[in-house]
């Protein structure tokens, strides 16, 4: 373990606490940020690959390139706060899996709003002795350049190691063809095959599956009812989820850690690999050469010690998210700073940076399961007597071909009804939640999540048993429009002293969002009545957190008005790559992470083909 006080585990190591957890912590102790004159043994300011951001996309690049022999450094503005598994999902604790509504507070605590208009409310009841402002306050992240009528008010970011994957839903559907960007021009079959190949690999990294909730009573109640109601019209299935069921009562949700464990290398498990993670480090500038054809350095600042240095690498990869990738590029001379002015000529470097941005519309409601559905749970049971009385019994006939439910279902119900005779519901307390979807299709061009999960909104009050609740979230697409922009101030900085992001966005008109709302209302009524306070509603713009198109992908920079090619390489620069949802140039309604990961895998294939890893000086002893 490093003796440097800048090591996040420094204070911890000085204590007398020597539990297994403490001993385990030493295995991934982090080196201090390397600077000239104080390099720890084996460290340098030069790497093969420098990655900005530690979410699933950054971890995809890290995994692919580290395993290919490259010496990789990863820089993350946030810190490690997800326990001993670096960048792991915070829902992987028994506490939150027993009470999902408690996890809402975790999400709310992690999210940081991107752009908040200045609060113009005046406090006119202050004491005359108190200092009073003559203009509006601009602290607490307020952005005086943000027009509240053109804001993505719900848009937020998560600044921790692992990014949003430390609290996401883990929904990883593939994009249907109408949502997908092209990777192969003029050959539909080849494009389909390429996407299938990339999706399969991405799904293996995330451990995506569709059977983790196959033995959930609530899941099957909702799924079977909707399949029955929409037979021959719509297809329903489990949401594709990046998760692994460990037991009937515990699911391990995937995250950045699942893709790549973020442990420094070499280590005993990977003695021939090279990787270092540097948390609490802000990347402030990517340095261009005089010819504007290559990146020659990455300026970073240690947020603890305040030291700034320049990192050298052969390849530079930005995976800090749709907002922060564009923010770093704008601060580095790409695109332009300041409010966009149509009268000015387009900038020479990445003229379409931050244009054509997209975000999904979101409608939401919650329903309480119908009496019909709850009564159907015990359809195969023979119930004698009253609960709490000596003669009370619940039985069924295993293997009876006339049973409406499988034996696993009936056994769970019988056991619960006998063990918990005080409970008016026949559904076991630890029955997994529903996770149902009807996927995007041309006739219904929206994505659906019919489930029970924690978001920054939608918690259930204590007076309602959450086993009865079903959440309905329908996500609509937005056509990319050049006038919908994300731009960065030339005057104001954010809390991290980086250029303040500002949105100039409005959802395009049309009937699609209203049709989606109608579809949700009709469908949800088949499951039950609305939960008071959670009636069907449109949610704040940006609350979906699926911002896309900030640095669009295409085949030709001018013709497609984009920033990167289909290998995610920035146009005009041979060694600068961008990863994440900001690359996706299409109107999409589904969760975009799996698609962004697939693009990162393709990008890694290009890097491995066009760059060589440096010789590995580490000596290995057998």
From Swiss-Prot:
It is found in: Periplasm. It comes from Trametes hirsuta (White-rot fungus). Residues 1-28 form the signal peptide. Keywords: FAD, Flavoprotein, Oxidoreductase, Periplasm, Signal. One of its GO terms (cellular component) is periplasmic space. Binds 1 FAD covalently per subunit. Homotetramer. The modification Tele-8alpha-FAD histidine is found at residue 167. This is Pyranose 2-oxidase. One of its GO terms (molecular function) is flavin adenine dinucleotide binding. Its cofactor is FAD. The active site is at residues 546, 591. Catalyzes the oxidation of various aldopyranoses and disaccharides on carbon-2 to the corresponding 2-keto sugars concomitant with the reduction of O(2) to H(2)O(2). Plays an important role in lignin degradation of wood rot fungi by supplying the essential cosubstrate H(2)O(2) for the ligninolytic peroxidases, lignin peroxidase and manganese-dependent peroxidase. The preferred substrate is D-glucose which is converted to 2-dehydro-D-glucose, an intermediate of a secondary metabolic pathway leading to the antibiotic cortalcerone. Optimum temperature is 30-50 degrees Celsius. Active and thermostable for 30 minutes up to 55 degrees Celsius. Substrate binds at residues 449, 451. Its EC number is 1.1.3.10.
